[in-house]
A protein has these predicted regions:
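Short hydrophobic beta-strand segments in globular cytosolic domains
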Residues: 47-48, 106, 111-112
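A contiguous, well-structured "functional interface" segment within a domain
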Residues: 1-36, 139-141
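Tandem CBS (Bateman) regulatory domains
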Residues: 1-12, 52-81, 85-96, 117-142
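Conserved beta-strand segments that form the floor/walls of ligand-binding pockets within enzyme
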Residues: 39, 104, 116
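Acidic (E/D-rich), amphipathic helical modules within compact regulatory domains
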Residues: 28-62, 71
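The conserved cystathionine-beta-synthase
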Residues: 17-34, 41-44, 81-99, 106, ...
Length: 142
């Protein structure tokens, strides 16, 4: 497990939004694409933030709620990133330390993807299934 890299566990298409998109657009795009977050890009395609279902949920319960509000007003700007060579172990530590579910994968200041807690869990499930099979095969060989 420690040797497995982020580049091997995150291979879904990365959907993005523009900072000028509305809350309504963000909500629709998250729903349509079955994702829990989307990075936000500026007019130069630079990542300037991230918005998640949690951000939208918090907004709905605030006095500022308005579906026409632009997402640059509510996006998280404190970006937590990793690179393609980050190990799964390092990624799990980062997610735990920062109490986050999504980490942006960046390489040379370019967005390469997003790795979610679900990606990590699926990786671990597959890892343990393989390990379980190997142990059963070993035991049954005697």
């Amino acid at each position: 497990m420690p040797g497995k890299l982020v580049s091997k566990i995150s291979n879904r298409k990365c959907f993005t939004l523009k900072a000028i998109d509305t809350v309504k657009t963000a909500s629709s795009r998250l729903h349509e694409n079955h994702v829990g977050c989307m990075p936000i890009l500026d007019e130069h395609q630079k990542v300037v933030g991230i918005i998640s279902e949690r951000d939208l949920s918090q907004l709905i319960h605030s006095e500022r709620f308005n579906t026409n509000l632009t997402i640059d007003k509510i996006m998280s700007k404190n970006l937590i990133t990793c690179d393609l060579n980050t190990s799964v172990t390092e990624l799990m530590e980062l997610k735990t330390d920062k109490k986050i579910r999504h980490v942006l994968i960046m390489e040379e200041n370019k967005l390469k993807g997003v790795v979610s807690i679900g990606d990590v869990v699926n990786h671990l499930i597959n890892k343990y299934k393989e390990e379980n099979k190997s142990l059963r095969d070993y035991i049954n060989s005697y």
